[in-house]
Amino acid sequence: MTLLDPLANALSHITNSERVGKREIYIKPASKLIGEVLRVMQKYGYIGEFEFIDDGRAGVYRVQLLGRINKAGAIKPRFPVKATEYEKWEKRFLPAFEFGILIVSTSQGVMSHKEARDRGIGGRLIAYVY
């Protein structure tokens, strides 16, 4: 069976593991995009430490959970967003103003919508976390 969206699978695995109270999980297969999303989540305090483990195949991420995630999910389709439109998408995907983050893929890398808005750059929405 083929895995169609590894990012959506990883985020649902994180959400489900948080709900049952796990403290450490393994996400496979690993990818650069999943690693960048984990980095943004760690920067905002949603997860603890994470590390890449090379298993000779696609690799695995070991992630420490802190119990701070209510919901995390991938945004499909990957909507293009201008630098001035972030508020509209916040209202659509986040439960309250300034609560949670949208993760955006920009020409300057993967970052949160807050960081992208401060830099004045647009991109494509790839995930949300709150």
Swiss-Prot record:
Keywords: Ribonucleoprotein, Ribosomal protein, RNA-binding, rRNA-binding. GO terms for cellular component: ribonucleoprotein complex; ribosome. Coiled coil: none annotated. Signal peptide: none annotated. One of the primary rRNA binding proteins, it binds directly to 16S rRNA central domain where it helps coordinate assembly of the platform of the 30S subunit. PANTHER family: 40S RIBOSOMAL PROTEIN S15A (PTHR11758). This is Small ribosomal subunit protein uS8. The lineage of its organism: Archaea, Methanobacteriati, Methanobacteriota, Thermococci, Thermococcales. The gene is rps8.
